[in-house]
Structures are given as C-alpha cells and as structure tokens.
Amino acid sequence: MQVIGRGGANILIDYGDPTWLWRCCIRWPDLLSSNNSYTIKNISYIKDYVEPLLHGLLCPMYLIDVDIEAIRPILSDFILNLDDKVVKVIKIKNLTNNTSNLILNNHFLKSYCSQNLQTVILELKPKWLYYDTDYCRNCTHNAFKGRGTKYCYNQLLMNPAHLELIFGECNIFPVKFKDAMHEYLRNDNNIFKILYDLQKKLTKNTTPISDIKSINDVNDEHLLLMTLRDVTCFIEWNSAENALHVNIIDVDLKPKEKWTHWTKTYSQLTSSQKIYHTSNK
C-alpha cells in the first residue's frame, strides 16, 4: 500500500488492486472524524448535484469504510488524531492502469501511453472554459503565476486546430489518435463544450466574485460553479476501437471558506498584466 498522488485536500492510495484506488480526504490535519464527516457530505454532493450534469462522464466512484488499522501507517503522516475506527474512503476507478509511460507532464496536461502506443491517455485540467471578463482568465492566471503555457483550452474549444499547440513538439502520438481527437472536438457534445455551457449558465446566475464580501454571499450555485472550474478530465484512446472514452474526476464540494482565496485571486488578476484572445467566447 502506497500513496501515489497528493493534492491540497486528498491523497490517492494504491492498495494493490490495479483497477481501483482509494481517495482519502486530508483537508483537516487535526482530526480524522472531520475528514470523515466531509467525505460523507462530499460523496452525496457529487452524486446528487454534480453527476446529473455530466452526461454519464463522471468517473465510477463510491463510498466505502476501511478499518483504521489497515490504513494507519499512511494516514498518520497526514492526520494528527486518528479518532475514528474506520476511514471514509472514496473508492475510485484507476484511469491509468493500462499505461506505463508518461509522455507529457506540465501544470494542465499529462499524457500517458502503453508500451506499444496502442493506448493513449490525456489528463487535462481545463479550468475556466467560460469567463465573463474581456481577458482570458486561464492565460492571465498562468502569466501571473509565471507559467509559460503556449496553449489554452478555451482556444481549443473555439478551434480544434489548437490541438497541435497542446501536443507541441511531441511527435509520438499516433495519427489515428490525433484524428479521433479532432473529430471529437468538432462534436458539440465534447467535454469542453459541456463544461463551457455549464460554467456559462452558472456564471450568469451567481454573484460575481468581485461582489462577494462575506461568506454569506456564497451560495450553493457558486460552489457548484467553482467545482466545475476545477475538474480533471481523462480522455482515453485505444487503437482496437479507435474510439475515445472520457471520465471526469476532482468534482469535490468546495468549502465556503475559500471565498477569501477566490476574491484575493480576482483582485490580483485585475491589477496584473492581462492576456487577451481575438476569439474568446
């Protein structure tokens, strides 16, 4: 058993099953019970509010109980007081178990392939596909953070030919895979268009970040919008089918307390150097 991934609020554990992984919340480092309570609330939120919006593209996941003794050696490195007898774990499908080679790895894109290139997987973070500012929120934020990204998922949505910028100088991808991606992006049911439409609808029905002055200004629709701005998408292609399979992860409920971070970031970007696109909406 080992940790194979860590974010700000979760760890991903390989427990020996090549098909499934355990996802454990570590958002609250003092008490296991606090993380357990959130996980129960989170999985209900995902199933009740997020999954119905995603056209069957949510990665398979469900809640299980794991005895604390089975996982204590790992969790004790992340949580001070393991004050429950069980750990509420989200069991989630392992989306990269058919691949072994990491081809590309940057802040918003990872790409994996099998040894014989019969399977290719893209792991993408499209972030703010819809934005209501005159500047590109993703590209402006990247510039503010000092990330020299040459591509933009909003631009990919507007023009599938932008895919070549995303792949860059990496020429290992099979032609059939590239063709399948281009065809997928021309379809209005592609995941980027789905997320764009959802983000646009929610943006128009929620309080702008610039107008949020306290936690009381953050409603459920705003939390859902921020969730959909932070998802990760897996797109898998295999040569046998010559077809794409899409899964979405990282659809967690955001704590309302994050409003201070959101408004601070908005203020920083407002006064920073902007990145504009001639075609952005």
Curated annotation (Swiss-Prot):
Q: Does the record bear Nucleotide-binding in its keywords?
A: yes
Name the enzyme's class.
transferase
InterPro entries given in the database record: Ins_P5_2-kin
Q: Where is this motif: EXKPK motif?
A: 123-127
Q: Where in the cell is it found?
A: Nucleus
The catalytic activity, as recorded, is: 1D-myo-inositol 1,3,4,5,6-pentakisphosphate + ATP = 1D-myo-inositol hexakisphosphate + ADP + H(+)
GO annotation terms (biological process): inositol phosphate biosynthetic process; nuclear-transcribed mRNA catabolic process, non-stop decay
For this UniProt entry, the molecular function terms from Gene Ontology, in alphabetical order, are:
ATP binding; inositol-1,3,4,5,6-pentakisphosphate 2-kinase activity
Primary location recorded for the protein, binned into one broad class: nucleus
Q: Known EC number(s)?
A: 2.7.1.158
What would be one Gene Ontology cellular-component term for the protein? nucleus
Q: Does Nucleotide-binding appear among the keywords?
A: yes
Keyword terms of this UniProt record: ATP-binding, Kinase, Nucleotide-binding, Nucleus, Transferase
One Pfam family from the record = Ins_P5_2-kin
Q: What does the record give as the function of this protein?
A: Has kinase activity and phosphorylates inositol-1,3,4,5,6-pentakisphosphate (Ins(1,3,4,5,6)P5) to produce 1,2,3,4,5,6-hexakisphosphate (InsP6), also known as phytate.
Q: Which family does it belong to?
A: Belongs to the IPK1 type 1 family.
The entry's free-text remark on domains says: The EXKPK motif is conserved in inositol-pentakisphosphate 2-kinases of both family 1 and 2.
Name of the featured protein? Inositol-pentakisphosphate 2-kinase
Q: Report the source organism.
A: Saccharomyces cerevisiae (strain ATCC 204508 / S288c) (Baker's yeast)
Q: What gene codes for this chain?
A: IPK1
